[in-house]
Amino acid sequence: MPASGTFGSGQEYSEFVDLNQLGAVVTKGVSLTPWEGNPAPRIMETSSGMINAVGLQNPGIDVFIERDIPFLQKFDTKIIVNVCGNSVSDYLQVVERLSETVVDMLEINISCPNVEHGGIAFGQEPKMVEYITSEIKKITPKPISMKLTPNVTDITEIAKAVEADSISLINTITGMRIDVQKRKFCVANKTGGLSGS
């Protein structure tokens, strides 16, 4: 199964990969409302992989339910939806909507910045991780996986705070690439997520 954010919503790769051969399709992040993402350039190769600063661009939950779920239902594979948000309310509303659909599992991306609490990622505070997990479990019967951020001092403390069905390790590591000749950042957002190539 592909990692979230690497495979779109499945449609983008269905001409190249037989989705029936995958144990599951993990979608890119889906938010309550459409997100435009970050300005370009968003992706840059590095000597050790790739920096991406896409910014969770997506059309929002309404379009996802109307367009992407019916497409994915055509295949004999599980559907895991990555959920993103900027507030606890955002997460809960998306989870509530997805609970009424045929998706098999929800992956909660707690690497998102919490705009209600100064922009720190939800997944960097154990009490917030515990709170958001318990609130989500109250409103959905679907299994949930909490996608943890590596950008913490002690990930074991965060993992112990998660009372989900599973955890997803890990989101990308914060990194940057600088063009030393031009003395400029290579991605418009300055930093992005460092992953393998």
Please state what every model-predicted region is:
Residues M1-I79, C84-N86:
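N-terminal capping/small domains of soluble enzymes
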Residues E15, N86-S197:
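Alpha/beta enzyme core
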